[in-house]
Design a protein with these regions (language model features):
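Short, charged/small-residue-rich alpha-helical element at the C-terminal edge
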Residues: 245-315
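Conserved ABC ATPase "signature" region
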Residues: 116, 120, 127-145
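Conserved ABC transporter NBD signature motif
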Residues: 76-87, 91-92
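A short, flexible loop at the N-terminus of ABC-type nucleotide-binding domains that lies
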Residues: 3-23, 27-39, 89
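ABC transporter nucleotide-binding domain
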Residues: 194-274
Length: 318
């Protein structure tokens, strides 16, 4: 056990010299017809929280399993610097922690025993282990349950224990699959705050989630998947800083609506449209022309910032 901890420590120190976790042309098919992951390439920033988004079955969990080496890709690689995780799966597991959607705590071990087991595997000495356990249990507000066995915990407490197990020992790369499911709003926020602290210390964090509001509030980057393909990726702020406009007006006949690709008709003759700033700039002269001709009237214009939810709907419903 001491030797395993020593190796983990050495690898963690070595990791600090590398800039990015890189996914290169990663491909996986389980039935030779449908791709779980279809030629995915992505660079994931160090010291950032990256959220993997997409519908159920989009390939997010499969991607995490390939990254840590539980599933072997049909082709492609996952690298950290010059280290290939596909070629050396043991090394990948030494450098990463992984929280799956299933509950991790062993049923007959207490919360504390589960954490202690993982902490010792990751090389923590007794003093540091106790300190980290106390800190995690306190910050997640589950200290009072430390002596409870896994089988006696509620779903939310099992999820929080699994989360703490992924964080104990501060692995350099942390993979989390829907870690806030079943967790109450107060503790969910504390989970994200812990992840932000780790990211600020230089850790690479990847989280699969369907909670888009939390992504906007806490994540640095996003990657959006659909049917096994990477659709779009980038900084969250790049999306939320984009201006979007909501236009409402009444129309005399539907011919005026030919200007717009997408619109919603409310109460018969009232139309509502949401468009981005560049599209509004293009359409303004034509809208003015329709106003002058009195084909449309009672025009109102409201500005708002685009959200991750807007991006999600736009990319996955077209």
């Amino acid at each position: 056990m001491k030797e395993a901890g020593k190796i983990f420590s050495v690898l963690s120190d070595e990791m600090k010299t590398f800039a990015t976790l890189t996914i290169r042309d990663l491909t996986k098919s389980f039935d030779k017809q449908h791709f779980a992951n279809n030629h995915i390439s992505l660079e994931i920033e160090t010291a950032k929280i990256t959220a993997f988004l997409g519908h159920n079955g989009a390939g997010k969990s499969t991607l995490l399993n390939q990254m840590i080496g539980f599933t072997k890709p049909d082709q492609g690689d996952v690298c950290y610097g010059d280290i290939s995780f596909v070629q050396n799966r043991k090394r990948a597991r030494s450098m990463m922690s992984y929280m799956s959607q299933q509950y991790a705590p062993l049923e007959k071990l207490t919360v504390e025993q589960n954490l202690e087991m993982l902490g010792r595997m990751r090389g923590l000495n007794t003093l540091d282990l106790q300190k980290e356990m106390d800190q995690l249990l306190t910050e997640l507000e589950i200290k009072e349950y430390r002596a409870k066995q896994g089988k006696d915990l509620s779903g939310g407490l099992k999820r929080l224990t699994s989360f703490a197990m992924a964080l104990i020992g501060s692995p350099t790369i942390i993979l989390l699959d829907e870690p806030t499911n079943d967790v109450d709003p107060i503790r969910r926020e504390k989970q994200w705050q812990l992840l932000q602290k780790l990211a600020h210390k230089g850790h690479t964090i990847i989280i699969v989630t369907h909670n888009l509001l939390e992504v906007e509030k806490f994540a640095d980057n996003y990657a959006l998947f659909n049917h096994g393909k990477l659709i779009k990726s980038g900084p969250v702020q790049q999306i939320t800083y984009q201006k979007q406009y909501q236009i409402s007006f009444e129309f005399r006949n539907k011919d005026s609506l030919a200007l717009f690709q997408d619109y919603t008709i409310i109460n018969g003759s009232i139309c509502q449209i949401e468009i981005e700033e560049k599209e509004l700039t293009r359409l303004l002269p034509k809208i003015k022309q329709e106003l002058d001709r009195k084909n449309i009237f009672n025009l109102s214009l409201a500005q708002k910032n685009m959200s991750i939810s807007d991006l999600y709907r736009e990319e996955l419903t077209n």
